[in-house]
């Protein structure tokens, strides 16, 4: 009997190890265009400060079976947390919490015969383990990109128990690492869905205008399985374009369409076309725009015309709520203020933001710069960190490669030159270009210095030559004093390439008045002067092709210690945490309206 029990345990263990690849899968393209069942709502939760939950197997969700049974945990009748949302903003006790919280909920699965079922997470911050009906089925690291797990053979029609172990502890090998200038939100911060597909489904596609040609659309579609000689139809009805093709041995088709009637997407006219992709068993629809973007010399060309990028940055945060933005309504709040400022581009700082923001930005006519949080302090010599970064970059590009608004893939922010850093960033660039060669590669540097001998601003980082566009963060008048008057500031940075000032500005407490030439006044008057000086300097940068003030809204940050002027907020916003526009906002509005 003992031998039989042991054999049973071994077989059970082998099944559990082989039934699931514990590394979560990269998400299928366009989850929001699939058949979905939402798992959003109130979830039960357990705060696990000492990380005892896994050791005690609380994911089994056991209940007493006899008079002597008891368990020192229960998901029911305790803490309940909203999903999607961060946990920090839901309870005062969790405001600064860094550690593990377990989420749990029951669900039934609606699955037609022959269908496959996937569990989709828009993002979980920062690392997580997923358990279904007592079995660990996946792990994922990275707080800003989607992932999925196939649960077709593990799910029951009724009474499934899903547990998610979430941990947001900062670590040296994480991305971002130990210190970063925004709030360390933890939790299931984006949508959770059950996604139903046919047995063989349309897994991935990439439909975009050629990088240069205005009349050529390139399309690549891949099935979920390596199935040859299967028919795939691609159609753009408004352009009267339609092709049916046979898959190769990899289950893929590649083709091109030619049309002289394509109206190209631009910030002034954000035209999108309905694209239909179908097989015998599956069909998916998507709105896709078509545009060309390239660099020539010191200029950036959109649809063949040189463009000046009137940008702004914001965090994925609703300051009035002091929490993560996660809904379409939140996207409207953030993007409407960017539109009011007169922007034609947004730098989504400093991580991939949710799909509602990306898709809404495209419809509203914003170009986008998207990046993963390679933000200072990254351990560039750690191979594990490098692998994580590559995976995050791949997940970001895969999710948003069909968004024509995406113009720039950002690969770094404020990093120090070294061979390990260069190798690390080259790995990210290669990851991007393996998926998508149509976008421009950009990075933001903070190494511009004033050369007293030449009386010129210069930057010593040869890596700029490996980028399509160079960006600079420079806080003159705030972290750096003015070595010359703004009208005498001469720049010799990234000569021969387009240059964007990707961050500038300073802090001001809304409503506070003070001396306009004293930084420590923390006043709107000083912030206004600072902006005037920077805008004057910009006139004298010959290859300047865009500006992006830091930042649209005040945002939460434990970096910021001043008890009266900051109180845990970075006050560089043009708009206060309560939604009021500061004096500098009106300066930028005038500047953008006249560019």
Label every PLM stretch briefly.
Residues 1-27:
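Bacterial Sec-dependent N-terminal signal peptides
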Residues 23-88, 163-165, 171, 532, ...:
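Accessory carbohydrate-binding/adhesion or oligomerization-edge regions at the termini
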Residues 29-30, 46-50, 93-201, 226-227, ...:
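Accessory beta-strand-rich segments of carbohydrate-active enzymes
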Residues 29-34, 205-208, 264, 276-339, ...:
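N-terminal carbohydrate-binding accessory modules
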Residues 131-137, 237, 280-281, 303:
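Short strand-turn-strand beta-turns centered on an Asx-Gly dipeptide
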Residues 155-159, 222-296:
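Extended acidic/polar, glycine-enriched regions
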Residues 199-226, 595:
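Surface beta-strand/loop "capping" patches
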Residues 220, 333-335, 345-591:
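Substrate-binding/catalytic cleft of secreted carbohydrate-active enzymes
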């Amino acid at each position: 009997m003992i031998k039989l029990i042991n054999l049973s345990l071994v077989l059970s263990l082998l099944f559990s190890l082989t039934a699931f690849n514990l590394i979560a899968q990269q998400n299928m393209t366009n989850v929001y265009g699939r058949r979905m069942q939402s798992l959003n709502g109130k979830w039960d939760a357990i705060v696990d400060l000492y990380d005892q939950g896994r050791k005690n197997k609380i994911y089994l969700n056991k209940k007493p079976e006899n008079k002597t049974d008891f368990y020192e945990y229960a998901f029911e009748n305790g803490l309940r947390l909203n999903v999607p949302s961060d946990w920090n903003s839901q309870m005062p006790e969790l405001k600064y919490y860094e550690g593990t919280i377990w989420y749990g909920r029951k669900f039934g699965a609606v699955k037609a015969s022959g269908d496959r079922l996937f569990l989709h997470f828009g993002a979980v911050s920062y690392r997580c383990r997923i358990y279904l009906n007592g079995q660990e089925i996946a792990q994922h690291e990275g707080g800003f990109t989607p992932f999925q797990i196939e649960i077709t053979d593990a799910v029951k029609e009724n009474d499934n128990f899903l547990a998610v172990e979430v941990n947001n502890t900062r670590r040296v090998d994480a991305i971002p690492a130990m210190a970063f200038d925004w709030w360390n939100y933890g939790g299931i911060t984006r949508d959770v869905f059950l996604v139903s597909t046919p047995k063989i489904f349309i897994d991935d596609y990439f439909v975009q205008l050629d990088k240069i040609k205005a009349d050529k659309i390139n399309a690549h579609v891949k099935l979920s399985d390596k199935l040859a000689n299967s028919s795939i139809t691609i159609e753009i009805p408004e352009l009267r374009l339609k092709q049916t093709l046979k898959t190769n041995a990899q289950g893929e088709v590649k083709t091109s369409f030619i049309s002289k009637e394509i109206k190209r997407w631009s910030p002034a006219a954000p035209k999108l076309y309905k694209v239909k992709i179908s097989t015998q068993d599956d069909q998916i629809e998507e709105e896709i725009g078509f545009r060309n973007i390239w660099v020539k010399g010191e200029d950036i060309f959109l649809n063949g015309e040189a463009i000046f990028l009137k940008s702004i940055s914001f965090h994925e945060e609703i300051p009035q709520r002091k929490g993560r933005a996660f809904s379409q309504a939140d996207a409207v709040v953030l993007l409407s203020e960017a539109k009011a400022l007169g922007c034609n581009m947004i730098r989504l700082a400093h991580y991939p933001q949710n799909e509602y923001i990306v898709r809404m930005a495209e419809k509203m006519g914003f170009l986008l710069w998207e990046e993963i949080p390679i933000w200072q302090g990254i351990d560039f010599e750690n191979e594990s960190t490098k692998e994580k970064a590559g995976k995050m970059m791949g997940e970001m590009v895969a999710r948003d490669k069909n968004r024509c608004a995406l113009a720039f893939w950002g690969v770094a922010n404020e990093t120090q030159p070294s061979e390990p850093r260069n190798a690390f960033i080259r790995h990210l660039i290669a990851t991007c270009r393996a998926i998508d060669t149509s976008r421009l590669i950009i990075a933001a540097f903070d190494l511009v210095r004033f050369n007293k001998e030449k009386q010129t601003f210069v930057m010593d980082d040869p890596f700029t030559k490996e980028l399509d566009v160079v960006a600079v963060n420079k806080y003159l008048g705030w972290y750096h004093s003015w070595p010359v008057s703004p009208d005498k500031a001469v720049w010799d940075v990234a000569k021969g390439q387009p240059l964007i000032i990707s961050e500038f500005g300073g802090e001001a407490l809304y409503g506070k008045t003070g001396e306009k030439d004293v930084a420590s006044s923390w006043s709107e008057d000083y912030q206004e002067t600072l902006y005037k000086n920077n805008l004057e300097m910009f006139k004298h940068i010959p290859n300047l092709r865009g500006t992006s003030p830091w930042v649209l809204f005040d945002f939460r940050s434990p970096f910021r210690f001043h008890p009266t002027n900051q109180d845990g907020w970075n006050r560089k916003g043009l708009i206060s945490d309560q939604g009021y526009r500061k004096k500098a906002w009106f300066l930028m509005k005038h500047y953008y309206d006249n560019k």
